[in-house]
Amino acid sequence: AAGGIGQALALLLKNRLPAGSDLALYDIAPVTPGVAADLSHIPTPVTIKGYAGEDPTPALEGADVVLVSAGVARKPGMDRADLFNVNAGIVKALAETIAVVCPKACVGIITNPVNTTVPIAAEVLKKAGVYDKRKLFGVTTLDVIRSETFVAALKDKDPGQVRVPVIGGHSGVTILPLLSQVEGVTFTDEEVAALTKRIQNAGTEVVEAKAGGGSATFSMGQ
């Protein structure tokens, strides 16, 4: 929760969760309680606490929804698969704790590479006997909002009125925007090819623009 995505997401949730909700932030970084203290000053009816250290148990107790954004971010020249060796272990450890502390929670995996971290979490939950396919999912909405933004810009439309289904997970060439299903617009073959390529490489565009300073965080938090 102390990382770029975690902080952006925490801000969004502090402002948008229903009144009376409890929001728990967890990170191994000691700054996490400070992030929560900062966000607690926003005048919304959402209670927020931050937890730091090696054990996520206090943050997970009683959780109905768990969003996992922990892990290392991409740097220029890396693709999402390069993150596997580090991030797979992080997701595995968190899933093991979730299986014990809040086995009935809905679990959303943001940590890349999503196409492989989600199956890892699934196997951990299966081994613990608490797997429910309805309650474990990969968060790939970023590809949808990117698609809607790019299509709207190309076709001079209101981004809020454009809907683009995206399938295939969140791993480079597997990202497939279904442009033929966008209502009210048509595309040439050249536009389809160019849009698809840009959507698939949008994450790399951000990583390179940040020049080693991180990956997509604000748009991911949204």
From Swiss-Prot:
GO cellular component, one term: cytoplasm
Effect upon mutating residue 194 to V: In strain: 523-80
UniProt entry tagged with the keyword NAD: yes
EC number: 1.1.1.37
Binding site for substrate: 74, 80, 112, 146
Stored SUPFAM superfamilies: LDH C-terminal domain-like, NAD(P)-binding Rossmann-fold domains
Catalytic activity: (S)-malate + NAD(+) = oxaloacetate + NADH + H(+)
Pfam families: Ldh_1_C, Ldh_1_N
Active site: 170
Keywords: NAD, Oxidoreductase, Tricarboxylic acid cycle
GO terms under biological process: malate metabolic process; tricarboxylic acid cycle
EC class (word): oxidoreductase
Residues annotated for NAD(+) binding in this entry: 1-6, 27, 87, 110-112, 220
GO molecular function annotation: L-malate dehydrogenase (NAD+) activity
PROSITE patterns: MDH
NCBIfam families named among the record's database cross-references: MDH_euk_gproteo (TIGR01772)
Complex formation: Homodimer.
Recorded family membership: Belongs to the LDH/MDH superfamily. MDH type 1 family.
Function: Catalyzes the reversible oxidation of malate to oxaloacetate.
Name the UniProt record assigns to this protein: Malate dehydrogenase
Provenance organism: Vibrio mimicus
Gene name linked to the record: mdh
